[in-house]
Each structure stands twice: as C-alpha cells, then as structure tokens.
C-alpha cells in the first residue's frame, strides 16, 4: 500500500487529508513555497488509497479546511483590468 521509505508520514498525511475532505474541503491542499494554498486533484483521488501523489511525497504541509478558508480570506482577489 504505502512505501514507507519514501516518507514515513505519507499514510498519516493521507488519513488526515481524508478527514479534511469529509469536513468540507473539495480538494486536498498543501502550502506552497509562496505561502499559498495549492490544490492537488491527484492527491485528492489518491488519499482514499492511503497515498499522496509523487509531487507531494515529501511535503508534510497539508492544510486543514480552516487554514484554507483563512488563507482564501487573506489573499486579495485579483481584479481584471478590462
């Protein structure tokens, strides 16, 4: 199921992500290097198998739904210049 030599926390991250999805998130989110919530549709489908995608194997910065909502409120929305 899980290759623990990749990241021993990968299964735990997947379990936590499943909880966050049940609590209202539509996608799994990780904190990116710019400090923004980054959705990962690949992880969203893989967490139900106890895995994360290859890009996020070593990323333990899983965001809860509360943090995602807070970051969305803090990030100013871009307005088009049309």
UniProtKB/Swiss-Prot annotation:
It comes from the Viruses. InterPro entries: Acc_prot_5b_avian_CoV. One of its GO terms (biological process) is symbiont-mediated suppression of host innate immune response. Disulfide bonds: none annotated. Keywords: Eukaryotic host gene expression shutoff by virus, Host gene expression shutoff by virus, Host-virus interaction, Inhibition of host innate immune response by virus, Interferon antiviral system evasion, Viral immunoevasion. Pfam families: Acc5b_avian_CoV. Involved in host translation shutoff without degradating host RNA. By suppressing host gene expression, facilitates the evasion from host type I interferon immune response. This is Host translation inhibitor 5b. It comes from Avian infectious bronchitis virus (strain KB8523) (IBV).
């Amino acid at each position: 199921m899980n290759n623990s030599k990749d990241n021993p926390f990968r299964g735990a991250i997947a379990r936590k992500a499943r909880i966050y999805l049940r609590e209202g998130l539509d996608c799994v989110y990780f904190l990116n290097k710019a400090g923004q919530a980054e959705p990962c549709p690949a992880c969203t489908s893989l967490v139900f198998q106890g895995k994360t995608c290859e890009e996020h194997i070593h990323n333990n910065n899983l965001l809860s739904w509360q943090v995602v909502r807070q970051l969305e409120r803090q990030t100013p929305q871009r307005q088009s210049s049309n």
